[in-house]
Structure formats: C-alpha cells, structure tokens
C-alpha cells in the first residue's frame, strides 16, 4: 500500500514554526508585563517607605526644609508611579496583542491539521476500496478458474 503524503506538509510546517514564534513572542511580552509590575510595586514600596519615614520624622523635631524635601521626594515618586502605571498598561496591551496573534496562528495550524486528517482518511478509504476491489477480482478469477 502506498504511503500517505500530505501535499501541504511544508505549508503546515511553516504554520507550526509561525505558531512557535508567536508563542515565544507572547511569553516574552508576559515577562515584560511582570517586570513592569515589579517596577511599579518597588516604586509604591519606596513611596510608602518615604511617607512612613516622614511620619516618624514629624514626631521628632524636623525642620520645614526637611519636610519640603520629603514632600518633594514623595511627589516625585507619585509621578514615577503614574508613569509606571501607564507602562504596565501598555505592556499588558502589547501582551494581549501577542496573545491574539498566537490564538490566530493556532487556529490556522489546527485548520490545516484538520485538512490533513481529512485527506488521510480519504486516502485510507480509497486504499481500502482499491484493496477490496483487488481481493474481489482475485476471488472472481479463482472462482471462474475453478468453474471452468
């Protein structure tokens, strides 16, 4: 029996490579999101530490210059936090875009695999029919030979 050869096998291979590439891109985008979230958490922690330090310093004798320095630092950290929140949102949007690209690549590969499976089933059906026809002809030939 001849071996099944899918005529679009190379195309399927390309689709699998594209899917692998999209998977790597999505994983990288997720790592960027996590890095940006970590940076945000660190900024928030630094701001909280500065606020707590200011509270403790106010309980002691502290000059207005020192209070202004603490406030300036806290305001700078608030601005950095706002910028970092935007960076997290941008990274999440980019990761979502990469996820959508991965989903699309998976759908395209899966559709081609379904075509391959259908072609293989059709090939096997035709091969079985050809084999059955050959067996029927052989039986008919033997029967005709026996009766002649």
PLM region spans:
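Charge-rich amphipathic alpha-helical interaction elements
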Residues: 1-148
């Amino acid at each position: 029996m001849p071996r099944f050869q899918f005529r679009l096998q190379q195309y399927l291979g390309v689709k699998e490579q594209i899917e692998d590439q999209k998977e790597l891109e999505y994983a990288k985008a997720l790592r960027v999101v996590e890095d940006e979230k970590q940076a945000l958490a660190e900024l928030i922690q630094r701001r909280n530490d500065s606020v707590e330090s200011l509270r403790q310093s106010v309980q002691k004798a502290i000059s207005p210059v020192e209070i202004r320095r603490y406030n300036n630092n806290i305001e700078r950290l608030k601005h950095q936090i706002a910028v970092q929140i935007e960076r997290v949102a941008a990274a999440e949007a980019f990761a979502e875009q990469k996820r959508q690209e991965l989903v699309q690549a998976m759908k395209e590969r899966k559709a081609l695999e379904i075509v391959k499976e259908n072609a293989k089933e059709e090939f096997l059906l035709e091969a079985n029919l050809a084999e059955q026809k050959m067996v029927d002809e052989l039986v008919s030939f033997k029967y005709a030979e026996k009766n002649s």
